[in-house]
């Protein structure tokens, strides 16, 4: 090896050592930061009429699989021991609900529940439905897959049966996929009741959706942005007589910058007559603000003990931003026969990584929130059919029917909750799986929070330095080409937009 090559190798090793030292130094600092953050969030909490907290270590069941496969839920869940505490510090156990028949539901709704093989209510359903049937506002803190969709759909359908009217209920969801899943749940549960529902999401025809709205559906499931489009432009459409409002996965809606859109929607819905359900996986200051739109809500919290799959091997790879893409290719090359999901933080990173991989000859597809619905479904179907690599934003981290995955790569480091959702895409159903996280000096705080949550230090992935240096030139070339392709695409879009403006 030449003297220049030795110098390069020495510098890279030194940089890795320095990065490892930084991680050690910031560990104590990060623990203090986590404690301070926890204390601050406690101070921000608003009073509620009652709080019910249920601890469970069960693995949640996907709402979609519950409907599409009609599996017997009793084989998937055992209700854990529960405890509840009210705002006056008294405590009692919530009633043990063994069957949906105990809710005194109308026969038509019970018939649908039984046909779906729903037997014993999940913890969130057992805790929330009785209060919802009494007409109380609900704040539900539970993960996707806990059965929360049925927890708010069943009370709405119960009251709708006795007082049916158009535009009776509105469900706001952060993504198109979740909106479709919620509609499936409502349609299945309301199949014996003549329910009319409509899904109002971006990427679909505004005109067709306007026609659907004019048919006076009972339940509207919508993403916030597209709903505002119809409130502003669809004649005769109004939410002034709305009886129920559901804000599902509010934490994700805030992450997707829908806070202002939700505020705008709330201003158009009479607060004095509506019942509101707010569901979220986490609680934050922003979500506390939305709680103010509820009337003395009952707060139901399912405290799930977050954990990664038992047969998951987790490692981390220390890298610099300049060598991050080369390290990614090294990892993908470890076993080209594996099914891989590469998670990124942004749409730009997803597109750039996918193009780079394609330029290097890999077969892959991308998945992100800016794709039309047809393309998103197409990407998932290609991955299911055998395309080995899926590059995706966190739209693929939860709530989607993604097949068995061998390897998850965290190209960008997420927060601890999203990390658990991401790596949970592998090592499923008792199978082994692996997750590797690429960590730069800019990711230290986020990475340490993950280790804190896991309660363990992740071992380093041993990737040969010589191999990385051998790949660097070809990866840099493929990356430059990908960046240029994105620039050309952006310029073409600008020209098309300018042409449309000139033709008006």
From Swiss-Prot:
Record's keyword terms, sorted: ATP-binding, Helicase, Hydrolase, Nucleotide-binding, Nucleus, Ribosome biogenesis, RNA-binding, rRNA processing
Protein's UniProt keywords contain Nucleus: yes
Reactions catalysed, as given in the entry: ATP + H2O = ADP + phosphate + H(+)
Ranges where the Helicase ATP-binding domain occurs: 129-301
Location of this chain's protein in the cell: Nucleus
Residues binding ATP: 142-149
Ranges of biased composition (kind: Low complexity): 34-62, 80-99
SUPFAM superfamilies, alphabetized: P-loop containing nucleoside triphosphate hydrolases
Superkingdom, taxonomy of origin: Eukaryota
Signal peptide: none
Region of interest (Disordered), ranges: 34-99
GO terms (BP aspect): maturation of SSU-rRNA from tricistronic rRNA transcript (SSU-rRNA, 5.8S rRNA, LSU-rRNA)
Keyword RNA-binding in record: yes
Function text: ATP-dependent rRNA helicase required for pre-ribosomal RNA processing. Involved in the maturation of the 35S-pre-rRNA and to its cleavage to mature 18S rRNA.
Protein name stated in the entry: ATP-dependent rRNA helicase RRP3
Organism whose genome encodes this protein: Lodderomyces elongisporus (strain ATCC 11503 / CBS 2605 / JCM 1781 / NBRC 1676 / NRRL YB-4239)
């Amino acid at each position: 090896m030449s003297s220049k090559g030795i110098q390069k190798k020495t510098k890279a090793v030194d940089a890795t050592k320095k990065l490892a030292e930084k991680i050690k130094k910031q560990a104590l600092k990060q623990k203090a930061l986590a404690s301070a953050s926890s204390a601050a969030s406690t101070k921000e909490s608003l009073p509620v009429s009652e709080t019910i907290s249920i601890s469970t270590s069960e693995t949640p069941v996907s709402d979609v699989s519950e409907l599409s496969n009609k599996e017997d839920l009793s084989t998937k869940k055992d209700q854990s021991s529960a405890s509840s505490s009210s705002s006056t510090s008294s405590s009692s156990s919530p009633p043990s609900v063994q069957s949906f028949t105990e809710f005194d539901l109308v026969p038509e709704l019970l018939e649908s529940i039984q046909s779906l093989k729903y037997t014993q209510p999940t913890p969130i359903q057992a805790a929330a439905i009785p209060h919802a049937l009494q007409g109380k506002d609900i704040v539900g803190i539970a993960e996707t897959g806990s059965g929360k969709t049925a927890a708010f759909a069943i009370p709405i359908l119960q009251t709708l049966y006795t007082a049916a009217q158009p535009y009776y209920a509105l469900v706001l969801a952060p993504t198109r996929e979740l909106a479709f899943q919620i509609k499936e749940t409502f349609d299945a549960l309301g199949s014996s009741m003549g329910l009319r529902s409509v899904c109002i999401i971006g990427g679909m025809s505004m005109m067709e959706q306007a026609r659907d709205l004019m048919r006076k559906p009972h339940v509207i499931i919508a993403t916030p942005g597209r709903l505002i489009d119809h409130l502003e432009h669809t004649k005769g459409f109004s939410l002034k007589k709305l009886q129920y409002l559901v804000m599902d996965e509010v934490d994700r809606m805030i992450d997707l910058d829908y806070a202002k859109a939700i505020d705008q929607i709330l201003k158009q819905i009479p607060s004095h007559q509506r019942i509101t359900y707010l569901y979220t996986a986490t609680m934050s200051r922003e979500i506390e603000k939305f709680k103010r739109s509820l009337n003395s809500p009952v707060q139901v919290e399912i405290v799930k003990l977050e954990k990664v799959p038992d047969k998951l091997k987790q490692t981390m790879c220390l890298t610099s931003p300049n060598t991050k893409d080369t390290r990614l290719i090294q990892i993908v090359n470890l076993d080209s026969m594996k099914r891989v999901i590469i998670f990124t933080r942004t749409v730009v990173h997803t597109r750039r990584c996918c193009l780079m991989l394609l330029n290097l000859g890999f077969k892959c597809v991308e998945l992100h929130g800016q794709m039309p619905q047809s393309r998103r479904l197409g990407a998932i179907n290609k991955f299911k059919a055998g395309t080995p690599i899926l590059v995706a934003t966190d739209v693929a981290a939860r709530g989607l029917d993604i097949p068995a995955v061998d390897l998850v790569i965290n190209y960008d480091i997420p927060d601890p909750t999203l990390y658990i959702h991401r790596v949970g895409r592998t090592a499923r159903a008792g199978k082994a799986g692996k997750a590797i996280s690429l960590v730069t000096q800019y990711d230290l705080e986020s990475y340490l929070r993950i280790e804190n949550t896991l309660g363990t230090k992740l071992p380093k992935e041993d990737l040969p330095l010589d191999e990385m240096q051998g790949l660097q030139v070809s990866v840099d070339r493929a990356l430059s080409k990908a960046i240029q392709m994105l620039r050309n695409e952006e310029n073409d879009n600008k020209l098309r937009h300018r042409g449309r403006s000139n033709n008006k």
